[in-house]
Amino acid sequence: KLSDHIGYYPLVLISPLDSEIILSGSSVRRKFIDSVISQFDKQYLSDLISYNKVLKQRNLLLKQSVYDDTHLKVYNDELVKYGNNIFVKRKDFINEFVPVLTKYYNYISSSKETINVNYKSDLLNFSFNDLLAKNLHKDKILKYTCSGVHRDDLDFFLNTMKLKKSGSQGQQKSFMISMKLAKYEYIKQKTKLYPSLLLDDIFDKLDNERCSRIIELVNNENFGQIFITHTCHDTMKDILNRINSDYIIFNF
């Protein structure tokens, strides 16, 4: 199975598409959380796969005009079992991850701004069992499950304001790069492996100071093999000349 191979060769990719984590819907942010935890926690990945399978079955049951409540209870029990495990591990992950993220953002931005991340989950205020019971009538009307960890989300803040609305392109990009560098460090700590780091055309829309600080960050023994792509050969060479390491340039 493909899931059996996740985590054996850890890889962290930083690319312009990462802005979707800030700008797109909650599913992209959940995918980010899952992509980190699954690298080192096989039980989490198994619970996540099982949860999504049961969720799909429960939603199919809700779409039927007539169904056996016994089946619904079976699905509820399974959702609660897997969902609670996922919730606890996501909450613990955010508590451990945010300080690492903050460290990288403060370095890249020279501590010019403050950031924070807020984990949003239905399970923060109510038990999953109570939520399913409370929302059963709504679920039957809408014919899908309205509560659970499949609705989890993250809010990103810059100086107490939503990053999506108040952050410049440079600030948003600095935040995303910080998230991926924090992901690298977090996975390395958990797996004791050095992931490969791919920097795919990430220096656009960043001022020289922030570019230099990113280069300084990755130019130490905390990082292993690094691949950097850029559309401009001269800019690429200027960036690499600041790295006190051997490098090879490939032109395509």
Feature locations, PLM:
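Extended, charged alpha-helical "arm/stalk" segments used for dimerization and assembly
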Residues: K1-L60
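Conserved NTP-handling cores and scaffolds of large molecular machines
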Residues: Y9, I37-Y44, L55, L62, ...
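Hydrophobic "anchor" residues on beta-strands that sit immediately upstream
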Residues: L11, S196-L197
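Hydrophobic/aromatic beta-strand patches that form the interior of the parallel beta-sheet core
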Residues: V12, F227, I248-F250
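Long, non-coiled-coil amphipathic alpha-helical linker/lever segments
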Residues: I33, F40-D92
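Conserved NTPase motor "head" modules and their coupling/switch loops across ABC/AAA+ ATPases, GTPases
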Residues: Y67-S196, K205, E209-F227, D234-I243
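Walker B catalytic acidic pair
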Residues: D200-I202
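A short helix-turn-beta junction within AAA+ P-loop NTPase domains corresponding to the substrate/partner-engaging
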Residues: L240-F252
